[in-house]
């Protein structure tokens, strides 16, 4: 008889622990030779003592403090670029000439020099503070000048009114600046000294409470006397600088002087010479240069002339009047600048970046999955000759794709043709009759007009065509909110032909969809990264670690930009700013940009997808007609027909590549020329494979209801359409799911089975899906906007018409 032996799964009671008497030898026996993970590591993490931790923390604080002080010392010093200050008056009552007169403070030993060729800026030199400023201004209504100057300004000086702070134009200006990215700023109040001494304290407290909404915990400075201007200048010199990510990794320059040399072939194109101080990063002559609002260009060479605004000019010591001294210094230095002109770098054609923006597809490589124009015409002829629809399936297509891929010659790859715009006129008539009467009366009561204002004078300010167009948009937006994605099945065209590009999905979230399937021909013109995130990290790492060759930060240089139209220098001579940014690798090439934006709460005008909008993306400005889609983490994203104010959404558009982070502002041009802020956000990704899926919902009515069966009508109007869409799953608004069993008759009635009994008031729905692509509507030219003025009449009249 064999003895009993315990198996490996027998019960093992918990061993008694010896407590403090547990020795090291017993611990080794318990471990049974197992080695801890820390001993296996090659590099042990050294545990610092408490004294070493304190020492390391103090060293880190010292390094941060030294870096901040070094940045302060460089900006505005003799070795760095001048401290560029943008003065923005936020109220119409503010006197800008008076503010400039106070800022030209001679009590601190400053020297004033008028900028040659421009009346909008001046240089301010202060040897006692070892600082130099370059002051310029922008009116809040001048949108392009304001945003362009804010891109390169080191500090923005906001001038506030002592009573109201800012008006409607100033508030609109702040909304745009906050969305673009605000650099270092300072708040100054002008005109407070005109109040009685007892009321000055109350006015300042009231203004501080008002300013807290936009600028929490910020101190208000005064600008009424020379002493207050001196305090303001010291604040500007010692203020900690805020960083804007999109400009810290690029070299940029504000043009102080611009000259144009026409080419031998034509007087309309030539070499543009722009002079200014290099900021941001080292400027390489082989990189491309983007002139804001004008496009991308190549540089021929970089010159290094003498700095025309030195902090300590030699002639100043031998003169009595500071203004005269600087004038003598500049006039004497002018011929020397030509003699001492040094060529810093010349472009190397082998290493210079190309201006190629689009890819050139090779038709022999078979890159295109979209048929040619000849194939589309042949498909149209075949459809006209044959009575039945024949499916053309590409080679290698799965059975799942073959179920829904048809001839695509009848429908444009846009949003859905004229049938997408079919509206429920009867519903809108009922909607206009039903509204809440009390609210309408209140709105009408608030629209009180003076008796002296005649109706004909009021009508002169109202555009009847614009009102009709806006009313139609409001109707479409309200229908989309009430019945999202629902569409009436057309009766003059068979549904299987009308929706031949659409397919059914078992689940919008989990069903597969190939992102490379049936791409449009425009996708052959763009560039795509194998891994955009890794490429971005690599480029940014090279910027931080590599020592670039070229013009260092703070140098006064002259850039020779080739093949520039003469309109650029004419734009500068009219008083507009000229700003240039260097481009990172690949940033001149076209791709698909996805931007996450949110609706501006100050704008309630309905905006439909594929309407032309104006984009301010980082340092670029362009026009395009984008797609709107939901911002989700899935692989498929639902197309949005209108902008929504309740959540963030993604805007997809063809545009040049830009590496995030970069701010995004969306404007819409009104018929009077003004640009209205629609949405704000940031650049999300550069990804052509991001799928935007448009959904169409066909609805039907349960005609006869049985236990789990029902006869549905009005979804289709012929037997062939019922058979065609039979594989697609049905759903109801009350949560039931079902399938089409068989058609009944020849008028589109069909027998359907569901997972439960239907209610008589329920609606049967069918979801169809199609991938949509953005249109190639990129236009780098953006017209200058009319100065922004708040208009209450148009919004009020639209509300009255809607009633």
UniProtKB/Swiss-Prot annotation:
| Start-end of Basic and acidic residues biased regions | 65-76
Residue ranges for the region (Disordered) are 1-83, 428-447
PROSITE patterns in the cross-refs: G_BMS1
Residue ranges constituting the Bms1-type G domain according to the UniProt record: 81-242
Q: List keywords of the entry alphabetically.
A: Nucleus, Ribosome biogenesis
Q: Which domain of life is it from?
A: Eukaryota
InterPro entries referenced in this protein's UniProt entry, alphabetically: AARP2CN, Bms1/Tsr1, BMS1_TSR1_C, G_Bms1/Tsr1_dom
GO CC annotation terms, alphabetical: nucleolus
- Its main localization is nucleus
Query: Ranges of Acidic residues compositional bias?
Result: 428-445
Tell me the compartments it is located in.
Answer: Nucleus, Nucleolus
The UniProt regions of compositional bias labelled Basic residues, in chain numbering, are 13-23
The GO annotation for biological process reads:
ribosome biogenesis
Q: Which SMART domains match?
A: AARP2CN, DUF663
To which protein family does this belong? Answer: Belongs to the TRAFAC class translation factor GTPase superfamily. Bms1-like GTPase family. TSR1 subfamily.
Q: What does the UniProt function comment say about this protein?
A: Required during maturation of the 40S ribosomal subunit in the nucleolus.
- Protein's name according to its UniProt entry: Pre-rRNA-processing protein TSR1 homolog
Organism for this UniProt entry: Mus musculus (Mouse)
């Amino acid at each position: 008889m064999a003895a009993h032996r315990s198996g490996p799964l027998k019960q093992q009671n918990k061993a008694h622990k010896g407590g403090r008497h547990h020795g090291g030898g017993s611990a080794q026996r318990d471990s049974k030779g197992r080695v801890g993970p820390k001993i296996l590591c090659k590099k042990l993490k050294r545990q610092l003592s408490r004294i070493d931790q304190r020492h390391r923390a103090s060293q880190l604080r010292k390094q941060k403090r030294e870096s901040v002080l070094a940045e302060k010392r460089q900006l505005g010093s003799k070795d760095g670029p001048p401290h560029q200050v943008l003065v923005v008056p936020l109220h119409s009552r503010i006197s800008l000439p008076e503010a400039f007169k106070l800022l030209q403070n001679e009590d601190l030993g400053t020297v004033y020099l008028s900028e040659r060729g421009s009346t909008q800026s001046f240089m301010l030199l202060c040897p006692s503070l070892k600082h130099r400023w370059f002051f310029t201004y922008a009116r809040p209504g001048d949108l392009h000048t304001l945003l362009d100057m804010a891109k390169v300004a080191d500090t923005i000086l906001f001038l506030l009114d002592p009573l109201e702070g800012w008006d409607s134009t100033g508030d609109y200006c702040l909304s745009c600046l906050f969305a673009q990215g605000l650099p270092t700023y300072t708040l100054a109040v002008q005109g407070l000294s005109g109040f009685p001494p007892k009321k000055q304290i109350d006015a300042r407290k009231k203004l501080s409470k008002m300013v807290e909404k936009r600028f929490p915990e910020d101190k208000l400075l005064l600008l009424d006397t020379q002493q207050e201007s001196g305090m303001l200048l010291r604040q500007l010199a010692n203020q900690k600088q805020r960083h804007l990510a999109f400009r810290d990794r690029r070299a940029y320059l504000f043009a102080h002087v611009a000259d144009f040399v026409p080419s031998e072939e034509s007087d309309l194109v030539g070499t543009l010479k722009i002079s200014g101080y290099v900021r941001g990063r080292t400027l390489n002559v082989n990189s491309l240069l983007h002139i804001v609002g004008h496009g991308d260009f190549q540089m021929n060479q970089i010159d290094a002339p003498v700095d025309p605004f030195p902090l300590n000019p030699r002639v100043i010591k031998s003169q009595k009047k500071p203004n005269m001294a600087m004038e003598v210094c500049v006039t004497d230095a002018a011929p020397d600048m030509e003699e001492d002109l040094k060529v810093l770098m010349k472009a190397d054609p082998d290493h210079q970046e190309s201006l190629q923006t689009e890819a050139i597809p090779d038709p022999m490589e078979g890159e295109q999955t979209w048929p040619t124009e000849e194939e589309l015409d042949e498909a149209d002829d075949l459809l006209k000759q044959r009575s039945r629809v024949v499916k053309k399936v590409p080679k290698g297509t799965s059975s799942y794709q073959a179920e829904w891929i048809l001839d695509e010659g009848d429908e444009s790859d846009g949003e859905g043709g004229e049938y997408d715009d079919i509206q429920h006129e009867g519903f809108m008539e009922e909607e206009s009759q039903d509204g809440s009467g009390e609210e309408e009366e209140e709105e009408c009561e608030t629209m009180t007009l003076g008796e002296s204002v005649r109706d004909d004078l009021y009508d002169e300010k109202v555009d009847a065509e614009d009102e009709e167009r806006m009313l139609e948009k409001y109707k479409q937006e309200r229908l989309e909110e009430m019945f999202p994605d629902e569409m009436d099945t057309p009766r003059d065209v068979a549904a299987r032909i009308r929706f031949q590009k659409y397919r059914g999905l078992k689940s919008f979230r989990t069903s597969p969809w190939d992102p490379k399937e049936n791409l449009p021909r425009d996708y052959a013109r763009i560039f795509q990264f194998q891994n955009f995130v890794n490429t971005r990290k690599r480029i940014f790492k090279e910027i931080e670690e590599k020592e670039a060759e070229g013009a260092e930060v703070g140098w006064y240089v002259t850039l020779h930009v080739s093949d520039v139209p003469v309109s650029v220098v004419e734009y500068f001579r009219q008083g507009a700013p000229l700003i240039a940014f260097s481009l990172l690798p690949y940033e001149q090439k076209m791709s698909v940009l996805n931007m996450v934006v949110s609706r501006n709460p100050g704008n309630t005008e309905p905006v439909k997808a594929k309407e032309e909008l104006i984009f301010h993306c980082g340092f670029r400005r362009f026009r395009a007609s984008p797609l709107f889609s939901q911002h989700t983490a899935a692989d498929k994203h639902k197309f949005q027909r209108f902008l929504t104010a309740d959540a963030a959404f993604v805007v997809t558009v063809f545009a040049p590549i830009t590496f995030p982070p970069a701010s995004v502002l969306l404007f819409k041009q009104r018929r009077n020329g003004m640009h209205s802020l629609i949405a704000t956000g940031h650049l999300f990704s550069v990804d052509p494979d991001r799928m935007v899926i448009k959904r169409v919902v066909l609805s039907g009515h349960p005609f006869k209801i049985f236990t789990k069966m029902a006869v549905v009508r009005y979804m289709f109007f012929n037997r062939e359409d019922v058979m065609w869409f039979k594989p697609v799953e049905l759903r109801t608004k009350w949560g039931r799911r079902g399938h089409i069993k068989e058609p009944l008759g020849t008028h589109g009635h069909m027998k359907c089975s569901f997972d439960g009994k239907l209610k008589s008031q329920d609606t049967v729905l069918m979801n169809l899906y199609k991938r949509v692509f953005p249109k190639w509507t990129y236009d780098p030219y953006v017209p200058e906007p009319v100065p922004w003025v708040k208009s209450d009449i148009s919004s009020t009249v639209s509300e009255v018409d809607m009633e």
